[in-house]
């Protein structure tokens, strides 16, 4: 059974988060904002020959729906896509809502937050178990806050997000090489950590509008979809409290306010974004022709096949 809190139970939310390394808040997202996004998304995914960068393969992928009409790959930083204004504006309204910033303030004690990275999932990609700290975190560590937004009622067979409650108080794994060259070793070390501590995965089949927040040291991931008729439409976003230093980031770009003055994005060079869009076409074509493997694989099934 999932423990959930109403958005007004702020102190209980904070206490549960600090004790367990995650917390679920019921109906934090307005249904109208979700429905507006889904309407724009259905228009967006019908576009032919649109290439985006995927989080699960860390390379460009083509918009291509499966037999059930779901997009197989996650979209990295969907709010930054070009030639998709209706889509990106509805993404922004969901992940930067006042309800979200109020919860972030309660958890961090800071008024303002910056979005470091976000993703959209149509179908579960079966994300391998990990700690966010390896990829991105604050300095001093442990102040990043991540959130998973359910955009529909999530069926248990859809490839649920999972957490290991209390694992944020256990061992924290560090990156040991630049450019994520030790990523496969990190995945292996994480599996060893899970085994040695008998960590148990807690599935989180959220209801539409629920949001799950978690700590950067918390072990989490997503199960593989076991019933193709179920999608798992959801956002993930990572937030840094304003004024915090960022691990492994010597310099940071200028920040700009979103539609919510308490949530910021990094300022984008839109010319470069448009040029990168066309470069992604070339990279996708080359990857398909050469059968190039992803540099950093996030799909758990790929590691299961290797073992």
Predicted regions and their residues:
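Non-heme Fe(II)-dependent double-stranded beta-helix
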Residues: 1-19, 26-129, 135-138
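Non-heme Fe(II)/2-oxoglutarate
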Residues: 2, 47-51, 55-58, 66-70, ...
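Double-stranded beta-helix
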Residues: 15, 154-219
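Short catalytic/ligand-binding loop motif for oxyanion handling, primarily in non-cytosolic enzymes
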Residues: 33-35, 125, 156-157, 171-172, ...
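Short, structured patches in soluble enzyme cores that scaffold and shape functional sites
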Residues: 119, 131-133, 149-153, 165
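Short edge-strand/loop segments of extracellular domains
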Residues: 123, 164-171, 232, 238-244
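A short beta-loop-beta micro-motif enriched in histidine and acidic residues
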Residues: 132-144, 199-200, 206, 230-231
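Short, conserved beta-strand element in jelly-roll/cupin
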Residues: 138-156, 205, 213, 238-242
């Amino acid at each position: 059974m999932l423990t959930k809190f109403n958005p007004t139970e702020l102190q209980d939310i904070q206490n549960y988060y600090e004790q367990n390394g995650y917390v679920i808040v019921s109906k934090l997202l307005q249904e109208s904002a979700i429905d507006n996004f889904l309407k724009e998304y259905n228009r967006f995914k019908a576009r032919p020959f649109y290439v985006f960068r995927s989080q699960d393969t860390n390379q460009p992928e083509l918009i291509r729906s499966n037999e059930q009409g779901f997009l197989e790959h996650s979209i990295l930083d969907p709010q930054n896509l070009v030639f998709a204004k209706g889509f990106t504006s509805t993404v922004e309204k969901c992940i930067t809502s006042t309800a979200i910033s109020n919860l972030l303030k309660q958890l961090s004690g800071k008024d303002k937050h910056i979005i470091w990275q976000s993703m959209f999932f149509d179908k579960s990609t079966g994300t391998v178990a990990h700690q966010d700290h390896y990829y991105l975190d604050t300095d001093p560590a442990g102040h990043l806050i991540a959130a998973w937004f359910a955009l529909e009622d999530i069926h248990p067979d859809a490839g649920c997000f999972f957490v290991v409650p209390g694992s944020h108080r256990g061992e924290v794994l560090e990156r040991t090489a630049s450019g994520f060259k030790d990523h496969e070793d990190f995945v292996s070390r994480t599996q060893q950590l899970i085994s040695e501590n008998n960590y148990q995965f807690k599935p989180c089949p959220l209801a539409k509008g629920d949001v799950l927040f978690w700590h950067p040291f918390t072990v989490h991931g997503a199960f593989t979809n076991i019933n193709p008729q179920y999608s798992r439409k959801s956002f993930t976003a990572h937030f840094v409290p304003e004024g915090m230093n960022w691990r492994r980031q010597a310099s940071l770009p200028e920040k700009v306010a979103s539609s919510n003055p308490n949530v910021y994005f990094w300022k984008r060079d839109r010319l470069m974004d448009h040029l990168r869009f066309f470069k992604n076409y070339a990279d996708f074509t080359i990857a398909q022709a050469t059968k190039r493997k992803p540099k950093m694989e996030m799909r758990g099934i790929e590691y299961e096949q290797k073992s």
